[in-house]
Amino acid sequence: MPKYKHVEDILKIMRNVEQVRNIGIIAHVDHGKTTTSDALLAHAGILSPKLAGEARALDYLDVEQQRGITVKAANVSLYHEYKGKPYVINLIDTPGHVDFSGKVTRSLRVLDGAILVVDAVEGVMTQTETVLRQALEELVRPLLFINKVDRLIKELKLSPQEIQQRIVQIIKDVNERILTFAPDPEIAKKWLLDPAKGHVALGSAKDKWGITIPMAQEKGIKFSDIVEAYAKGSKDAIEELFHKAPLHETLLDMVVRWVPNPREAQKYRVPRLWKGDINSELGKAMLNCDPEGPLVVFINDMRLDPHTKRLVATGRVWAGTATAGKEVWLVNAQKPGKILQVSIYMGPDREIVDYVTAGNIVAMLGLDDARAGETLVDINYKDQAAPFEQLHYVSEPVVTVAIEPKNPRDLPKLIEALRTLSIEDPNLKVTINQETGEYLLSGMGMLHIEIALTQLKEVYGLEVKVSPPVITYRETVRKPGEKVEGKSPNKHNKLYITVEPLEKEVIEMIQKGEITDDQDPRERAKVLRDKVNWDADTARRIWAVDEENFNIFIDKTVGVQHLREVKDTILAGWRLAMKEGPLAKEPVRGVKVILWDAVIHEDPAHRGPAQLYPAVRNAVYASMLTDSPTLLEPWQKLDIRVPNEYIGAVTGVITKHRGKILEVIDMGGQARIVAAVPIAESFELPMELRSVTAGRAFWGTEFYGWEPVPDQLLPELIRKIRERKGLPPEPPKAEDFLGP
């Protein structure tokens, strides 16, 4: 089969948006997502059908091939005929492992529909729920593929009736979550899965067959025939199944029939996902997915091309047509840019083309200043430009290692490699410890960091030394602190500040993007008044929102002279104080900083950053230290499946590691244990769980949240962090910041 059978055909169809579908395949790790993708790719003439299932075509990083899990979200355009009509299906592969959920979120923004793959034996797991919730929040329509049905017959030896019960239960579980997570009850009702209509497929991605109820009726396939084929272990009968009901045909037919085309989808997705004026020319062009309108592209992926060593920006064209030479405005970066080349993806390779029209996925060269999450618009429309909402990732980087090259001469190469890695994956944070000069790499878990380290070795040829992993903590306050006076070094400026805990509901609203730094202040005040009963005056007086660490600055002063002129300087000082708290120089999280009064010198020479930064910092630190400051530590949620006889052993391991059991669910012979443990205690867990369950526990993990460190562990932990950072072991007291 020729490798690129259909590039010209694909381009022709892409122009007609009714014949385009943008889909992804989402799942819990190891439920068969990549194998399902391969079955689709074989059909598109990109892989030979014999290799599908073994080849893992979308996993084109060597790391992924070795670990057998998908890390980079790749994209490919497929060609499919349904009822005699040709369609282009843009398939975006999304990682299923929890450490990469940032990439999943970015991929979802460019999709209109998703095939949710669920393992028939394991059912709906934590990560299944997480990716489904993210898809629904991004208004991506889910369809269901229940994979590994052969395991129910071969391994669990279930009767046809028991298999039916298991399948009905999985559909019910998914539907319950659609009702819970869909942002709009109308959409939830419309998107509920109805197997009789063909919203659900069953099959085996490994054996490459799949059926829906309408298709089985049409082709005369009985479920009892499938059970018999596997029960007998008949290779011919299974091969026959593949010929009668090939998985690619079943899934792609389902996609064409039930996933909305880009124009239909943009009508309800744009108003919810884009922050601009829907009635502007840009807004109308996006609502109508108009290829003749001004260009708007949302970038979901930045990646280094291994051949050209240039950065490739991949994204979805929401309006207009992307062409080489097009001048654009980068809305978040607030910079102009120029597209030098446009192409479409065929697996890891890009095919250069003249143009890509609205509703399709494009890869572009030349936009080195862009980052994942950037919005590009035609430069002539920059006044109407607004970003798509900030993407909300589910986790935050919480594990850090220090790295240095084994050969000191490689340092410039390491710096460049780290810069590129952090562009490709915004969930990897690279920082330099100013005191020690170390390069610090932070990620969402040890697996996330290990993969980055492997890439340093394999892609960049770097040998590096790595420190043991360090957990990132956050500083916060438990009760409102006292009002304190912060003086500038020249004593001419005084700020009167208190620090209080920020309500949990407000932190969640910042996380979800309901409250942002650049929001219209009146709109923000209304949201806070209506949803969390803030009084109107306080809500209107918010000066800034720290979206990274969830803090708010409020100005409650009355009639202070010269305050407006130094507002930006005060806020810059506040942001610096939020980056490193007083206890252990860890970021400050979840606090309200209130400015009650101020004395500002009239001469600008006496009120610059060198004077005001220390005044803000000293006041914030002193107020935090007056009343019960503490550290928050990151926790991980575990979703464990285990035979019933091991429940006691598993709960024992969890509690030994300061964990808590959230629920235990009986699943008939198997138990599902949902638990949470501090990440600091999680490094040994996999080995211990395997040993106490004789290797029979499966589990998934995801970020659980931040919890206060127990008081009895706090002093020792603060001392350790301070010593590691080269600080005096004892934390400062409030009076240390209140100078004479």
UniProtKB/Swiss-Prot annotation:
* GO CC annotation terms, alphabetical: cytosol; ribonucleoprotein complex
Using the record's annotations, give every residue carrying the modification Diphthamide.
H606
Residue ranges annotated for the tr-type G domain, each copy included: 18-263
InterPro entries, from UniProt?
Answer: EFG_II (IPR041095), EFG_III/V (IPR035647), EFG_V-like (IPR000640), EFTu-like_2 (IPR004161), G_TR_CS (IPR031157), P-loop_NTPase (IPR027417), Ribosomal_Su5_D2-typ_SF (IPR020568), Ribsml_uS5_D2-typ_fold_subgr (IPR014721)
Q: Where in the cell is it found?
A: Cytoplasm
So where does GTP get bound? 27-34, 93-97, 147-150
Q: Which GO terms describe its molecular function?
A: GTP binding; GTPase activity; translation elongation factor activity
Q: Which residues form the signal peptide?
A: none
What UniProt keywords apply to this chain's record, in alphabetical order? Cytoplasm, Elongation factor, GTP-binding, Nucleotide-binding, Protein biosynthesis
- Domain of life, per the record? Archaea
Function of the protein = Catalyzes the GTP-dependent ribosomal translocation step during translation elongation. During this step, the ribosome changes from the pre-translocational (PRE) to the post-translocational (POST) state as the newly formed A-site-bound peptidyl-tRNA and P-site-bound deacylated tRNA move to the P and E sites, respectively. Catalyzes the coordinated movement of the two tRNA molecules, the mRNA and conformational changes in the ribosome.
Q: Which family does it belong to?
A: Belongs to the TRAFAC class translation factor GTPase superfamily. Classic translation factor GTPase family. EF-G/EF-2 subfamily.
Kindly provide the name given to this protein in its UniProt entry.
Elongation factor 2
Tell me what gene encodes this. fusA
